[in-house]
Amino acid sequence: MISCENIHEVFKKNGIEYFTGVPDSILKEWINYVVDNEDKIVHRIAANEGAAIGHVVGYYLSTDKVGVVYMQNSGLGNAVNPLTSLADSDVFGIPMLLMIGWRGEPGKNDAPQHKKMGKVMLPLLDVLGIPYEILNDEDMSEQIKNAKEKAKKEDTPVALIVKKGFFSGYIAKKKEGDILGLCREEAIHTVVDTFNGDEIVVATTGKISRELSEYRQARGQKHDKDFYVVGSMGHACAIAMEIACQRPEKKVYLFDGDGALMMHTGTMATIGYYAPENLFHI
């Protein structure tokens, strides 16, 4: 395993001091390290992976320096448009490094929503014409150096693939404060306790879906009117809106996440335009 301090020093040695992207569990330790060292680097948390490509393009255009975009491979699809129509060497030729966490790696146990992208990620990068390195402990320093040089020389994005367990443990120093005094799980329980059993419920990606499912089980309730959006982060609100429009006689509750909502905020305008009165967005 590689320490977060070690890889940070390698980036620094190669003149890389700009990082932007969307958090990923495989990269969690390293991202926590980046956040703790924001006074020494430039760090932008992007709304989605496509926006992160835009951030790093703006950084390069204004500084002539290569930056890093980090993401989970499930978010690669969000980045394909700007990668092919903006950063590609046949368009503007913007050098950058893509640091991609490899969920759903073939042969490894992972959640169902990660299996397809885990299988097709490397072939997809090949089709996109994006060179890549699968980082390993022994060659990491040389791999990053070569990737940066290749990106600059060929005016192209280059990907650094990170497998699960690549980073050693790191405990974040910065802690988030308790703003509302009500945790996510308590909020879900409070709302569910008001249900009469006839509602349709949509829950967004991640822990919200998991916590709703666990609470249903703990109370001996059925899941037949729940839809757990295990993937497709940011699209639960579109799913819930359309269900509400098609089933106006039903109350439709959406448990959404702040990060998921920010990822595709434009859907809020669509919801506002069609304004289904039976949709409750929480």
What positions do the PLM features span?
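Thiamine diphosphate
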Residues: 1-241, 245-251
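Active-site metal-binding loops of divalent metal-dependent hydrolases
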Residues: 257-259
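A short alpha/beta connector and helix-capping loop motif
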Residues: 84, 93-96, 263-282
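Short acidic/glycine-rich loop or secondary-structure boundary segments that cap or lie
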Residues: 210-212, 262-265
